[in-house]
Amino acid sequence: MPKLKTKSGAAKRFKKTGKGGFKHRCANRAHINTKMTTKRKRHLRGMNQVAKVDTASLVQQMPYA
């Protein structure tokens, strides 16, 4: 049986957590941030958890994560 391929786009965007979930970067932070308040930019700084309903599809996309 051939090896399963990892979706490279998903591998770049998501990281697996210790408990089997996934985390990702906050959206709306790439560019044109001058009009955002400092508070808004600060809250977008960290990582977010992926919803449980989306975890199954990420496991299929990244079989070796």
UniProtKB/Swiss-Prot annotation:
<dbReference type="InterPro" id="IPR018265">
    <property type="entry name" value="Ribosomal_bL35_CS"/>
</dbReference>
<protein>
    <recommendedName>
        <fullName>Large ribosomal subunit protein bL35</fullName>
    </recommendedName>
</protein>
<comment type="similarity">
    <text>Belongs to the bacterial ribosomal protein bL35 family.</text>
</comment>
<dbReference type="InterPro" id="IPR021137">
    <property type="entry name" value="Ribosomal_bL35-like"/>
</dbReference>
<dbReference type="InterPro" id="IPR001706">
    <property type="entry name" value="Ribosomal_bL35"/>
</dbReference>
<feature type="region of interest" description="Disordered">
    <location>
        <begin position="1"/>
        <end position="22"/>
    </location>
</feature>
<dbReference type="GO" id="GO:0006412">
    <property type="term" value="P:translation"/>
</dbReference>
<dbReference type="GO" id="GO:0003735">
    <property type="term" value="F:structural constituent of ribosome"/>
</dbReference>
<dbReference type="GO" id="GO:0022625">
    <property type="term" value="C:cytosolic large ribosomal subunit"/>
</dbReference>
<keyword id="KW-0687">Ribonucleoprotein</keyword>
<keyword id="KW-0689">Ribosomal protein</keyword>
<dbReference type="InterPro" id="IPR037229">
    <property type="entry name" value="Ribosomal_bL35_sf"/>
</dbReference>
<dbReference type="Pfam" id="PF01632">
    <property type="entry name" value="Ribosomal_L35p"/>
</dbReference>
